[in-house]
Amino acid sequence: MNSSNIRRIQNEYNKINNDKNLYADSFQINMVDENIFLWKVNIKGPENSLYENYNFELEIELSNDYPYSSPKVKFITPIQHMNVNDKGDICLNILKKDGWNASLNIISIIWSIIVLLDQPNPEDPFNSELASLYRNDKLSYDKKIRDYCKTHSKLWTF
């Protein structure tokens, strides 16, 4: 592990904490057991989305060669979303090897996930059944997502 990699991770974490008032209504980040490579994120479902005001916990695992490779990001809170599989893995271009570059950072990942909650991508789904429902019966899709959130998610209380 290169000390500049650790410094980059520490700088990102410090910046997020220093600016936390800017993000407090959208997400919260904490290291897990003071492990610089493992972060817990709580995201508030975006306004006017099917996930509005629900709290979603994610885990971010940074590798030894971050920022030269993307972190592993997954939902811990169960979620019904066409771009998230049942293990919590997220289908998002910037998390893929060919979509990642070292100029991206954790903040850009989090904002991209928040946007994905509001604007799912039916062209690149993990859950093709949900994507098909979204395209063919939006009312049933909306109900399915809302019902799942009510059952499996907690409201944002941060």
From Swiss-Prot:
Q: Which PROSITE patterns match?
A: UBC_2
Pinpoint the UBC core domain residues: 4-154
| Catalytic activities | S-ubiquitinyl-[E1 ubiquitin-activating enzyme]-L-cysteine + [E2 ubiquitin-conjugating enzyme]-L-cysteine = [E1 ubiquitin-activating enzyme]-L-cysteine + S-ubiquitinyl-[E2 ubiquitin-conjugating enzyme]-L-cysteine
Q: Does the keyword Transmembrane helix apply?
A: no
Q: Which InterPro entries match?
A: Ub_conjugating_enzyme, UBQ-conjugat_E2_core, UBQ-conjugating_enzyme/RWD
Task: Report the EC number(s), separated by commas if there are several.
Answer: 2.3.2.23
Q: Name one GO molecular function term.
A: ubiquitin conjugating enzyme activity
Q: Organism's domain of life?
A: Viruses
Q: Does the keyword Transferase apply?
A: yes
* Purpose: Catalyzes the covalent attachment of ubiquitin to other proteins.
The name this protein carries in UniProt is Probable ubiquitin-conjugating enzyme E2 L460
What is the originating organism of this protein?
Acanthamoeba polyphaga mimivirus
What gene is behind this protein? UBC
